[in-house]
Amino acid sequence: MKILLDTLGSDKGASELIEGAIMALEKKDFNLTIVGNEEENRNIVNKRFEEKIDFVNATETIENNESPTKAIRSKKDSSMRKCFDLLNEDYDGFLSTGSTGALLTGATLITKRLDNVSRPCLMVTVPSLKGEVVVLDVGANVDVTSDLLEQFAKMGYVYSKNILGKEDCKVGLLNIGVEEHKGDSLRLETYQKLSNYPYFKGNVEARDVLKGDFDVVVTDGFSGNILLKTIEGSVEFIKTLAKSKLSKLDEKSQQIIIPMIKSMSSGIDYNSVGSAPFLGTKKPVFKAHGSSNRNAIMSGILTLIKFIEEDVTDKLKKELTNE
C-alpha cells in the first residue's frame, strides 16, 4: 500500500506531520511518499524506515487565501498538486493539512468523482452517547440540492457501516424540528427522497446529534460546518469553565475530576479524530486539521489505510449505482 503525505500547509510545520507518519509506520506496514521540501524532510526522517519512505520535492505551497481552482491549475510544483498527480498514477491514498477548497477542487478536477457523484463531500465523525456519529457535509459544499443531500446520505451510510461497523445504521436529516413537515423547501424535498431508503429514520435537531440515536447526520456544508464548530466551541467553553471551577477545589477532588473532563473532551479534539475523507472520489483524499499534531496525523493515516483496506471506494460505487 502506497500513501502520500503533503507536508506543506501545516500550521505546525513538516516535522510534526512526519513524526506522526513515523508513528503510523510503527503500527502498520505501508509505503510512504513524503511530498514537500525534500532536503528538510530527509533531515527530519533521518534515515528512519529507509526502505519504506520515498521523497518528492515541491517548491510551491497553496495558501488558504488563494483561489482554489486557480491555485490547483497554476501551481503545478506545489506539494498538493504533485500529490494529486501522483495519486492518479499508482498510489492508494493521500493525506493533507492544506486548504480545504484546494483539496476539494483537486479531488474533483484531478482525482475525479465516482459515477453518479455530483460533488465530493467532506465528512467527520463526532462522539456521542452511543458511539461515533458521521456528519456530512461539514464545509465542502455550501450550496446544495436535494439530489446532493441524497448522495451524501448514501455515502455516509456506507462509511458508517464499513468503517465504524454500524450494521443497523440509522441516517437522519439535520433540521429545525423532528416532524416531517418541518424545514425549508430543500429539507422538505430531501426528506421525501430519503424516505425511499430503509435506513432513513427522519429529521434530527442539532441538540440531539450527540445523543447518538442517529449514526449518520446529513446536511449542507454551511449548516454542517456551523454544527461542527459549535460542538468544538462548546467543548472548549466547558473545559475553560471547568478549569476555573476546579481551581477552587482541594487537590484530592481535582485528581478525581480532571481525568473525567479530559476523557469527555478528547473525542471532539481534532487531534484525536485525525482526519476526514472527501467521500465520492475515485481514490481516497483525506483532510487533516491545519493545526494537527503528530498523534492526529498518525490517527489520520491509520484511518486512511483502513478506508483502503475495507475497499470503501468500491462499496460507495456500488451503493451509488444501486438506484
From Swiss-Prot:
Coiled coil: none annotated. Pfam families: FA_synthesis (PF02504). InterPro entries: FA_synthesis, Phospholipid_synth_PlsX-like. It is found in: Cytoplasm. GO terms for cellular component: cytoplasm. Keywords: Cytoplasm, Lipid biosynthesis, Lipid metabolism, Phospholipid biosynthesis, Phospholipid metabolism, Transferase. Its EC number is 2.3.1.274. It is an enzyme of class 2 (transferase). GO terms for molecular function: phosphate:acyl-[acyl carrier protein] acyltransferase activity. It catalyses: a fatty acyl-[ACP] + phosphate = an acyl phosphate + holo-[ACP]. The keyword Transport does not apply. GO terms for biological process: fatty acid biosynthetic process; phospholipid biosynthetic process. Pathway: Lipid metabolism; phospholipid metabolism. Catalyzes the reversible formation of acyl-phosphate (acyl-PO(4)) from acyl-[acyl-carrier-protein] (acyl-ACP). This enzyme utilizes acyl-ACP as fatty acyl donor, but not acyl-CoA. Homodimer. Probably interacts with PlsY. Belongs to the PlsX family. This is Phosphate acyltransferase. It comes from Finegoldia magna (strain ATCC 29328 / DSM 20472 / WAL 2508). The gene is plsX.
